[in-house]
Amino acid sequence: MPNDLLKEYKNAWDKYDDKQLKEVFALGDRFKNFISNCKTERECVTELIKTAEKSGYRNIEDILAKGETLKEGDKVYANNRGKGLIMFLIGKEPLYTGFKILGAHIDSPRLDLKQNPLYEDTDLAMLETHYYGGIKKYQWVTLPLAIHGVIVKKDGTIVNVCVGEDDNDPVFGVSDILVHLASEQLEKKASKVIEGEDLNILIGSIPLKDGEEKQKVKHNIMKILNEKYDISEEDFVSAELEIVPAGKARDYGFDRSMVMGYGQDDRICAYTSFEAMLEMKNAKKTCITILVDKEEVGSIGATGMQSKFFENTVADIMSLCGDYDELKLRKALYNSEMLSSDVSAAFDPNYPNVMEKRNSAYLGKGIVFNKYTGSRGKSGCNDANPEYIAELRRILSKESVNWQTAELGKVDQGGGGTIAYILAEYGMQVIDCGVALLNMHAPWEISSKADIYETKNGYSAFLNN
């Protein structure tokens, strides 16, 4: 019987020679560095713009202000309020023939501070939080946490905050009941063991010695913050402060084959998309990489995929190329092809019952395609067309990229969604495609370095073909 009659998704580690192994681990190190230093959307955008500019990308606002035009080979980026980024490499073909698009998100599940967060209770200073995205709340207690973000004062001054990452920094955390007194707590459903209103951060316990103030611990904390950041309590109202796991991403496993780190959903696909884009020197079709905010809460708002920022920026690009009208814009979007660069769930041998083995993703077997996501009867899904999938199979086979297909768990087990359906509304071809993770949405997620490498190569192959 011919060997090609049956399908087998092979382990990517088996094919690497010494040169490729060095590339795999080097990419893993770059990715670890990125997610260790970029734990918020703003931090991601700031860092990626610095790197992009070194590779020749220019801010579209500067180009518009100078009245310049664009031509084949030009590299442009657009910054959406410091929390979203779109990159363009102008191709040879007319823009109305369509784009090659990679799209990932750079927001991740976390705890956000409320607008009036600071209070004192029994001589302890605390911060109120509101969790962001889908989390198992019990996973966020008794962990060392860091505070990242910005405080914007009334005069418009932006104060950057990052506390808990340096070895000399303090860390913070959410406490839990000692097991000796937890009999009632342990009888609760896992979803109720820790309630949302229980996710309060302990930040101090020393009372202010001087004065007659009643809330002396709270007052002392504000004194420290005022001395360090020149802020008052009211400035929390116009702050965007995110509570995230403290510490760097680490190698995982004796063989260092995996990465453990916070925010891999979806910065792992954002980073591999970014690297694939930087590798492009010229293109037949114009290439676009979209990195957006707010995917974890429905892609809404000014910095989410549902905003008009992407469409408006594409219109600007077409105008700068001297090729804009409304009909051409619509044709360009309709004729485009996109990889919705988002993570998938890896099969976990500790929890096999939620997955269907024949349609699951596995660590080490390469980039994962999810033909559809959604839940129950494919509700809310983007269901990719088979003609498009066949084209992608051809491209990846040609470039020797390891790939696999998967669903997000068993039928009726649950489900999820991405930004794919939003771009598909333009009529373009879209499929979800990214890295499989263990511990998805937990404070510390796990990925395979082989999958990171194959995903970056898969994105590069897509852009180049």
Curated annotation (Swiss-Prot):
Binding-site residues, Zn(2+): 105, 180, 441
Protein EC: 3.4.11.-
GO biological process: proteolysis
Enzyme class, UniProt record, top EC level: hydrolase
Key words, A-Z: Aminopeptidase, Hydrolase, Metal-binding, Metalloprotease, Protease, Zinc
Needed co-factor(s): Zn(2+)
Molecular function per GO: aminopeptidase activity; metallopeptidase activity; zinc ion binding
Domain of life: Bacteria
Record bears the keyword Zinc: yes
Signal peptide residue numbers: none
Cellular component per GO, a single term: cytoplasm
Record-stated family: Belongs to the peptidase M18 family.
Name assigned to this protein: Probable M18 family aminopeptidase 1
Annotated organism of origin: Clostridium acetobutylicum (strain ATCC 824 / DSM 792 / JCM 1419 / IAM 19013 / LMG 5710 / NBRC 13948 / NRRL B-527 / VKM B-1787 / 2291 / W)
